[in-house]
Every structure is written in C-alpha cells, then in structure tokens.
From Swiss-Prot:
GO cellular component: nucleus
Phenotypic consequence of residue 24 to A: Decreased interaction with TPL
Species assigned in the record: Arabidopsis thaliana
Gene symbol of the encoding locus: IAA12
Protein's recorded name: Auxin-responsive protein IAA12
Compartments, record wording: Nucleus
Induction: By auxin.
C-alpha cells in the first residue's frame, strides 16, 4: 500500500512541475521571443544602410559621360553620331564647292564656244556660193572653216565632185587658190566690191565676206593682177 501511495503522489506532482517549468520558460524567455518576432529594419543593419546611402549619393552626384550616351536604333555612341554628322556636312560642303567649280568651268567653256560661233566675231555664218556654168547655188558655213585651204576643199567637193558636169573635167582638186586652174575663188565684201579670196588675212576675210563666187580666170583677170602675175611666173618658170 505504501508503494502504491508513493506512485500516486509522484504522478500527482508531475503536472505541477511541468506547469512550473512552462511558466518559468515563458517568464524567462518572453523577452527573447519578442525580439525574434519583431520585423527587422535598416536600424538593425547599420553597415548595410550606410553602404546603400553612399552608393545612392555617388550615383546622384556623378552623371555618366556624354560620350557613353547612345542615340537611335541600333544604339550608336553620341560621339560617333556627332562625327558622322560632321563628316556628312563636310562632304556636302565639298560637293557644293565642286559643283561651283564645274559651273565656272562650264560657263567659261560656253563663253569660248560662243566666241567661236558668234557671227559678230567670226563672220556672217552661212554665205551663198555660185559658180559660173552652174545654175544652182549653194551655201557654206564660214564658221565651220579655219583657213582658206579648208574653205577651198569644201567648195571643190561641192561643185567639182558633182557628176554630170563639165567642170569636174576642167578643174583639179585644190586648185582654186594656187592659180593653176581655169577657175578662181572670189568674194563680194560688205562694200559691194569683188575681190580674190586669199589676198587678205583670214580673219579679215571672214569678217567682210558677203557672198562667194567661183568664176573663170578670164573674168577674174582684172580683179587680181597679182594672181595673174603669179600664174604667169609659174608658166615661165616651170618646176
């Protein structure tokens, strides 16, 4: 009986001891539990807070360099964009200068051409040409010739190269100026006088010629005694 009573007494004392321990644990560990259940703030981590504040202040104080900025798509550095714009501007300026030089050269060339074909400078342009024995006259552009020889060649091809005429048999090529043909080349000046072609300088001739005529030497003998004398000397002194 004694053993049973001690066991019962021991069992009855267990809840009281456990409650005592639980109460002591809550009373002793209450402060620690409150600390563990509280929400942490930046004040609990002073080192981290100072680091973030330092980084934010550094980012706000120093702005990135302008050369690192990107423009457009695909991204292009601002300094490269500026260089491209400057290059384009320089190319445009050079192109304008080149166009200006070309225009100046072209204007000079046009002036030269106008001086060459200007009738006031280089004669009257087209003049009428007649030949004895040929009823149809022709016209020749005086501005297209640079010498008496060129003019004589053109006229000989016009008239003596025609088929069905007797003149082709009488006149040899390039004989209108040397006095060895039965025909000579004459012209009428602005004053209405007939003269032999070749007695005056070429520029004076083209500025004064009004029309041309290929006439026989018999009719032209009174126009150019010098040419007739030259012809007589050639006959007397054959080469």
């Amino acid at each position: 009986m004694r053993g049973v009573s001690e066991l019962e007494v021991g069992k009855s004392n267990l809840p009281a001891e456990s409650e005592l321990e639980l109460g002591l644990g809550l009373s002793l560990g209450g402060g620690a539990w409150k600390e563990r259940g509280r929400i942490l703030t930046a004040k609990d981590f002073p080192s981290v807070g100072s680091k973030r504040s330092a980084e934010s202040s550094s980012h706000q104080g120093a702005s990135p360099p302008r050369s690192s900025q990107v423009v457009g798509w695909p991204p292009i550095g601002l300094h490269r964009m500026n260089s491209l714009v400057n290059n384009q501007a320089m190319k445009a300026a050079r192109a304008e200068e080149g166009d200006g030089e070309k225009k100046v050269v072209k204007n000079d060339e046009l002036k030269d051409v106008s001086m060459k074909v200007n009738p006031k400078v280089q004669g009257l342009g087209f003049v009428k040409v007649n030949m004895d024995g040929v009823g149809i006259g022709r016209k020749v552009d005086m501005r297209a010739h640079s010498s008496y020889e060129n003019l004589a060649q053109t006229l000989e091809e016009m008239f003596f190269g025609m088929t069905g005429t007797t003149c082709r048999e009488k006149v040899k090529p390039l004989r209108l100026l040397d006095g060895s043909s039965d025909f000579v080349l004459t012209y009428e000046d602005k004053e209405g006088d007939w003269m032999l072609v070749g007695d005056v300088p070429w520029r004076m001739f083209i500025n004064s010629v009004k029309r041309l005529r290929i006439m026989g030497t018999s009719e032209a003998s009174g126009l150019a005694p010098r040419r007739q004398e030259q012809k007589d000397r050639q006959r007397n002194n054959p080469v």
